[in-house]
Design a protein with these regions (language model features):
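Intrinsically disordered, low-complexity
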Residues: 1-12, 61, 105-120
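Catalytic cysteine-centered active-site loop
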Residues: 11-65, 111
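Short, well-ordered turn and helix-capping elements at secondary-structure junctions
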Residues: 17, 73-75, 120
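Flexible domain-boundary/linker segments
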Residues: 22, 95, 101, 107-109
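Short hydrophobic/aromatic patches on the structural cores and recognition surfaces of FHA
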Residues: 29-30, 84, 116
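...with weaker cross-activation on analogous glycine-rich loops/strands in unrelated enzymes
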Residues: 39-102
Length: 120
């Protein structure tokens, strides 16, 4: 999954984007990676909160590379408002602007942390 995600490093954030031809928003990026990583998963195209509903809760201590990481209140919506792919060692790959590796231990991400999830 991480190998698929790395193909898109540096691509810009585009609201509503869901494929390499349009670029991505956060959930479009994660959905594309899940659907195209070769693990046989299919989540369609959904929101960060929709992806959260397709996952089992994982404690931070049990999070593994490839699990999803969810954040809330990154903009005015209820539930999960941002999603990334946990890569281990306190890092995620996500569609910020651009798609990049980011520490989940910054004050910003720690203040918005909602939880980890593993695709069912």
């Amino acid at each position: 999954m991480i190998e698929e995600a790395e193909k898109y490093l540096g691509m810009p954030y585009v609201w509503g984007g869901s494929s390499p031809s349009t670029s991505f928003d956060c959930s479009g990026f994660v959905c594309w990676v899940i659907n195209n990583c070769g693990n046989g998963w299919s989540v369609g195209r959904t929101t960060a909160n929709g992806l959260r509903g397709k996952c089992s809760y994982i404690s931070p201590a049990d999070a593994q590379p490839g699990d999803l990481i969810f954040f809330e209140k990154t903009y005015n919506t209820t539930g999960a408002s941002h999603v990334g792919i946990y890569v281990g060692d306190g890092m995620m790959i996500h569609c910020g602007d651009p798609i990049s590796y980011t520490s989940i231990n910054s004050n910003y991400w720690k203040s918005h942390f909602l939880g980890f999830g593993r695709i069912n």
